[in-house]
């Protein structure tokens, strides 16, 4: 699996997205095994897996919304959907206490600096979910006042399509984020191991399901599914 080195030096002046460099590398744990004995290599692998397991099963979202997609996001917190099953029910009112933020709705030009400021106030590790067509690509608002995709100024980890997406789509996006977090390579502390942040290049769902969708010959209306 290929990894993308998203942060080389935590104190670097050019660490701000999208100025910071992004380098595609191999799995740092596998490459580092050559210079370690069997015990230390296995111990580091187990520690990374354990820490990633704790991170992905205890994701605290930052509570803010931009448009109608936020209504669908909050619906996922109700009893019929029960987002608590994934450990993401603890809504935080401060970005300094949150693990990930969901850009749910239309992002206007005037709002972009505010969102970026909130993202910078979040502590590492942190992740971003882009929810809905407007957040992904500007949606139907191809005008001067709307940002044509929040990845223009934020590093997005998961894109959720739809206008607006259903709560089930948000839950699927959350599970994809958990899967990605389980493959990440982050420093275990400020003195242990490589201090770079490596994020796995996860395959897009449309690529994984393309063959299955091509084989579909019997098309039905949504009411019959």
UniProtKB/Swiss-Prot annotation:
The keyword Transport applies. One of its GO terms (biological process) is aerobic respiration. Keywords: 4Fe-4S, Cell inner membrane, Cell membrane, Iron, Iron-sulfur, Membrane, Metal-binding, NAD, Quinone, Translocase, Transport, Ubiquinone. It catalyses: a quinone + NADH + 5 H(+)(in) = a quinol + NAD(+) + 4 H(+)(out). Its cofactor is [4Fe-4S] cluster. It is found in: Cell inner membrane. It is a peripheral membrane protein. It is an enzyme of class 7 (translocase). Signal peptide: none annotated. It comes from the Bacteria. SUPFAM superfamilies: HydA/Nqo6-like (SSF56770). Its EC number is 7.1.1.-. [4Fe-4S] cluster binds at residues 68-69, 134, 163. One of its GO terms (molecular function) is 4 iron, 4 sulfur cluster binding. GO terms for cellular component: plasma membrane; respiratory chain complex I. Binds 1 [4Fe-4S] cluster. NDH-1 is composed of 13 different subunits. Subunits NuoB, CD, E, F, and G constitute the peripheral sector of the complex. NDH-1 shuttles electrons from NADH, via FMN and iron-sulfur (Fe-S) centers, to quinones in the respiratory chain. The immediate electron acceptor for the enzyme in this species is believed to be ubiquinone. Couples the redox reaction to proton translocation (for every two electrons transferred, four hydrogen ions are translocated across the cytoplasmic membrane), and thus conserves the redox energy in a proton gradient. Belongs to the complex I 20 kDa subunit family. This is NADH-quinone oxidoreductase subunit B. It comes from Pseudomonas paraeruginosa (strain DSM 24068 / PA7). The gene is nuoB.
């Amino acid at each position: 699996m290929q990894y993308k080195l998203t942060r080389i030096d935590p104190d670097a002046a050019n660490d701000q997205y999208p100025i910071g460099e992004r380098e595609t590398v191999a799995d740092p744990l596998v490459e580092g095994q050559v210079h370690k004995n069997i015990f230390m290599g296995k111990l580091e692998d187990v520690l990374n897996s354990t820490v990633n397991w704790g991170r992905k099963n205890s994701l605290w979202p930052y509570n803010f919304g931009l448009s109608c997609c936020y209504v669908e996001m909050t619906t996922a917190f109700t009893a019929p959907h029960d987002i608590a099953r994934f450990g993401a029910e603890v809504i935080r009112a401060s970005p300094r206490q949150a693990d990930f933020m969901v850009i749910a709705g239309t992002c206007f030009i005037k709002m972009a600096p505010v969102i970026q400021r909130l993202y910078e106030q979040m502590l590492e590790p942190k992740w971003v979910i882009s929810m809905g067509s407007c957040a992904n690509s500007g949606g139907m608002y191809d005008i001067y006042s709307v940002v044509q995709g929040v990845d223009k100024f934020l590093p997005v980890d998961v894109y959720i399509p739809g206008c607006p997406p259903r709560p089930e789509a948000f839950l699927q996006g959350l599970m994809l984020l958990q899967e990605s977090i389980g493959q990440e390579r982050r420093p275990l502390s400020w003195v242990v191991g490589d201090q770079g942040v490596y994020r796995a290049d996860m395959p897009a769902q449309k690529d994984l399901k393309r063959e299955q969708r091509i084989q579909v010959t019997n098309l039905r209306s949504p009411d019959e599914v």
